[in-house]
């Protein structure tokens, strides 16, 4: 390639005359003159230019253009990520320090049982005629109060020193599940993230004030999905999971709390000899819907060895209704838990199904490895 053509190409790529002069070992005045002469000769040279040369030049220019666009997009994305991280950090700091919860009085009696709180499908920020973020908080904390009173009733017979909190997913309403969802929420994704995380913190702290030790097992749901189903976003990159992680870190100083991350889409609950699975419910069936018979058959296949971990029961959310179905072995059950939400128009009109808001409370015999008492806790 001649010097004039090279100088013209560098100029086209955005290099200044001084940069070109430095690269070619020339004076700037010589570069200007050389580029001008080359431009004048360009029409004549183009007559002898082959189609392949023109195609190569077009591809080169297109590549340069795309590279510039990618650089700008990357810069914008990095700015957005940094803004999100900064906003989250500032929102967390605004919550203030969270002091450790004083432990309850020890109960040294024998035959202790454990409580299990199945809290699922809060749909944080969902708006219906009877539900919004404020109602969500009221109902969740009402469950905590009722669970405390029921625990006291159980303690009249035996100690209840340990609690497992099973967060079942769809804790946030999200924004990516159906067209028009943006018009059925009262909070942005950012506000959902902060509000639900703080409510999870408050629930765990309430449990720590009642029980000597608390373990959280957390499962994420389909409403926490980021983007559409067609987007190449890993399933575990989920807003529910993000709320759990923030709450977990805010409670990192609680020595009586055990809370691990949840990268898998099915979680395990273990209390002494009691073993159960925690799933959201959209894992079974097509498009997140399955009949009760299909759900139970799925659990039976898992129990027979398809799932590589022996368990007795399965806890399911997702359907916003409270149910219990026996498994084939006559021992285990599939426990389906309701939602804090009420008056869901889609469920009532399209599915002809609706339910009063409720959550689930169990008591577990860790030696016998089974549920000893089951409560449907009404929240309305």
Outline where the language-model segments fall.
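Core catalytic region of metal-dependent phosphoesterases/phosphodiesterases
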Residues: 102-119, 133-247
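Basic, amphipathic N-terminal segments that precede the first structured/catalytic domain
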Residues: 27-157, 365-367, 378-380
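Short, amphipathic alpha-helical "recognition" segments used to contact nucleic acids or chromatin
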Residues: 1-15
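Short alpha-helical "recognition helix" segments of helix-turn-helix
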Residues: 19-22
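Conserved beta-sheet core of the metallophosphoesterase superfamily
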Residues: 208, 235-264, 272-377
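Active-site metal-binding loops of divalent metal-dependent hydrolases
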Residues: 120-122, 169-171, 221-224, 281-283, ...
């Amino acid at each position: 390639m001649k010097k004039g053509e090279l100088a013209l190409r560098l100029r086209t790529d955005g290099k200044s005359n001084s940069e070109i002069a430095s690269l070619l070992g020339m004076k700037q005045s010589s570069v200007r003159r050389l580029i001008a002469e080359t431009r004048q000769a360009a029409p004549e040279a183009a007559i002898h230019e082959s189609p392949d040369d023109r195609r190569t030049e077009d591809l080169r220019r297109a590549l340069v253009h795309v590279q510039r666009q990618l650089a700008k997009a990357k810069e914008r994305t990095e700015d957005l990520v940094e803004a999100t991280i900064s906003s989250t950090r500032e929102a967390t700091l605004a919550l203030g320090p969270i002091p450790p919860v004083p432990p309850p009085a020890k109960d040294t009696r024998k035959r202790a049982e454990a409580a299990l709180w199945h809290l699922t499908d809060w749909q944080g920020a969902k708006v219906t005629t009877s539900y919004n973020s404020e109602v969500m908080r009221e109902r969740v904390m009402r469950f905590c109060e009722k669970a405390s009173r029921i625990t006291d009733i159980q303690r009249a017979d035996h100690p209840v020193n340990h609690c497992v909190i099973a967060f079942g997913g769809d804790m946030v309403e999200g924004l990516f599940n159906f067209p028009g969802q943006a018009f059925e929420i009262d909070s942005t994704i950012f506000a959902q993230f902060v509000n639900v995380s703080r409510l999870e913190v408050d629930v765990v702290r309430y449990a720590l004030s009642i029980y000597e030790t608390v373990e959280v097992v957390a499962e994420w749901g389909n409403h926490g999905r980021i983007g559409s189903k067609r987007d190449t976003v890993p399933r575990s990159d989920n807003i529910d999971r993000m709320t759990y992680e923030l709450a977990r870190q805010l409670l990192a100083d609680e020595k009586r709390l055990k809370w691990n991350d949840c990268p898998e889409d099915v979680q395990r609950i273990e209390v002494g000899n009691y073993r159960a699975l925690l799933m959201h419910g959209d894992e079974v069936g097509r498009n997140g819907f399955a009949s009760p018979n299909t759900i139970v058959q799925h659990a039976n296949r898992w129990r027979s060895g398809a799932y590589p971990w022996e368990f007795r029961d399965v806890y399911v959310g997702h359907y916003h209704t409270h149910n219990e179905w026996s498994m084939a072995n006559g021992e285990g059950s599939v426990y389906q838990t309701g939602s804090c939400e009420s008056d869901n128009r889609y469920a009532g009109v399209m599915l002809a199904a609706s339910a009063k808001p409720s959550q689930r409370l169990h008591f577990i015999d860790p030696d016998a490895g089974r549920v000893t008492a089951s409560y449907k806790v009404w929240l309305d």
